[in-house]
Amino acid sequence: MEHYDWNEGWLFTPRFDPALVRPECGLELEPVRIPHTVRVLPYNYCNENEYQCLCGYRREFFAPREWAGRTVLLTFGAVAHDATVFCNGRRLFHHACGYTAFTVDLTSALHLGQKNVVAVRCDSREDLNIPPFGGQIDHLTYGGIYRAVSLDIKEPAYLRDVFIETKAEGDFRIYTSTVGETVGCTLQAEIRSPSGSRAAYSGELSLPITGVLNGVHPWSIEHPTLYTLTVQLIRPGSAGLPDRVLDEKTIRFGFRTVQFVAGGLYLNGQRVELRGLNRHQSYAYQGYAMPDSIQRLDAQILKKDLGCNAVRTSHSPQSPAFLDACDELGLLVFTEMPGWRYIGDESWKAQALQNCREMVCQCRNHPSIFLWGARVNGSADDEAFYKRTNEAIHRLDPTRPTAGARNHRKSQLLEDVYAYNDYSYRGRGAACEARAAVTSDPRKGYLISEFGGQQLPTKPFDDETHRLVQALRYAAGINDSIAQQGVAGSFGWCMADYNTHREFGSGDRICYHGVMDMFRNPKLSAAVYASQKTPRSPSDIVLEVSSGMALGDLPGGVPTACWVFTNAESVRLYRGNDYIAEFTPDRHGRFAAMTHPPIEINDFVGSLLEKYEGMDQASAQMAAAILNEMRRDAMELSPLSKARMLSLRLSWNEVARMYYKYIGVLGTPCAAYRFEAVWHGRTVRTVVREPVQSVRLECTVHNPILTDGPTWDCAAVSLRAIDQNGSLLPYCGEAVQLSVDGPLKIIGPSVVPLRGGMAGTYLATTGEAGRAVLHCRMEGALDTDAVVTIRCRDA
């Protein structure tokens, strides 16, 4: 058994020519590294026609004579979207799904002891009669060999697949499938715990290996314990010869039980309230073509930064590296068959059914996956078709339920869970529809598969009010899905902004639906999710203030709502050095069902009137109520406040004077406000809002140590313009000039504008080890540098 990474040495042409597959090729070809995208696109105003092409890849290699009598298998992690593989001019394999892996047996076409050629005809055109194509699609589909490639040299008989079914109590059942002549062969399995203890089992090929492992630690969201299974295919020795290991497969898995009932989701017998986001697997410039480290980073952002416990992989199976990270972090995954609204003819459906089978077979050992999507997202009912998809999935994996995201009520429910894209909220009333009014079978599970961002696209540079409205809508969706009995939870739409087709988005080919921008910089809405984390240390405390406290940014210069998104116990507010008030979450208000409801800051006067106006406590409280009402209602006063003015013997001029002094209007001196997050009785985080005195450019490299190999690696970089207190400057739109010293290259442009005070870039390795420095320069701010260390795996 030999394994080789095959991500180097590829040549690419954007226009396929039959000469590409021949042993000798005189075409002009571009050297590329895998993962590869057929076309690097601009951040916005891109053209989806540019990546739609019939292109080709070619790789030459030497096949040693020692491979005689062996099986040579070439595996592609994903090729978007229709791939035909040739070896030495001979057509060997065709694969018509851009989101699943496939393996090609090269053995019969090889010339041993000679140079050989593998070529791939890659069709990324969107007129293909395969999923997800056929209708309009609200995301780009890109093209190319965008996941890793590998070559395996095996015996003629080998293991094709290993699948382990488990229960939380330790029961397991191991299934295998083989290729080649295996008469007389046996199986040997070993399960290794995280502590290193081992348990061995043996079995025959015709039956699954079953057993019970005592004292297991179940895989859960809080404790994602992973075990390792190694299965060997053994040919018994004869005539005194020892047994021979023909093949070996190692997988990671977890012991856990998933159950959906009318009351919700139960993991290992414990109810779980799903709080998740939808994730597209696309990135700025590169589309789908990003290495494992970037895929894993998204899982870390979802779990650690955003506080999610679940993710929906909209709208296709996603990177194995992403799923590995979800396994490790305890992030539940709802993955689904490729497609968007459209259902095609019988040929299209046959391919969709094959996609379902490949999705399940390739992903079913991941304990993080708790739900299979057996419908095309948002599609109409099709009883015959969806009976087949559900049957295929349950036959290959009886341990997990199925669902299917639909856009309409009372849809035919062939799955185990009714998943509903709920875009009913318009800012008033309930943020999600009544479960009973939607599901066609109240005895089954129910979840909200999408809500939120599509209803109010929000750019990072939108005004303060717009950004706040989006955040509060996300909060309402989370809250109401929790509050409604029988709803298993919700998946907000969506994690990050994404490029889309001309029929969608904001006219610049971007859907600004995310709680983050395309570079994974957080918008205000991200704090809604992040603040739901349970803090275990001061570093876990979130404190995000919705307002910049700049009157000139608000309509009419009249201050309006100010909200704080936090998981602290309380928030203290100061004006200058004067304490105003302490605020706690309203456990009976609009967001009472949330673990950590957002806090409305509705008192900007507090005890100031006692200190500076000589009022007694009762009078000060009445007067403060008048001033805060004026702030809330644009200087209007209710009859109650007018009565209070009479009671306090306050004239309108006197009330106006105090309003100008303690709250302010356009032209009055700007106050400095300090917000303090209190946790366990002490201040652990502070936000200051005051006029900007200096501008800094902050550069964060999220993965500063890179490893070149088995593919190129990549550093994700976030850029933010901040003031002297570290607060984001959302209207800073300066250009940032980027340059690199050392073995890295910038993906995309070397000059990037700040959007909403934020930007980003990606730095790709080049095959060399060393130290690289990213230089960031912005007019009006000091230069900023960041250091990245690059290692080569072979080194």
Predicted feature residues:
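Accessory carbohydrate-binding/adhesion or oligomerization-edge regions at the termini
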Residues: 1-42, 121, 471, 475-478, ...
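Active-site-adjacent substrate/metal-binding segments within catalytic domains
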Residues: 38-63, 67-76, 80-87, 93-96, ...
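Accessory beta-strand-rich segments of carbohydrate-active enzymes
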Residues: 3-16, 37, 48, 52-159, ...
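Beta-strand-rich structural segments
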Residues: 174-177, 231-233, 562-566, 713-730, ...
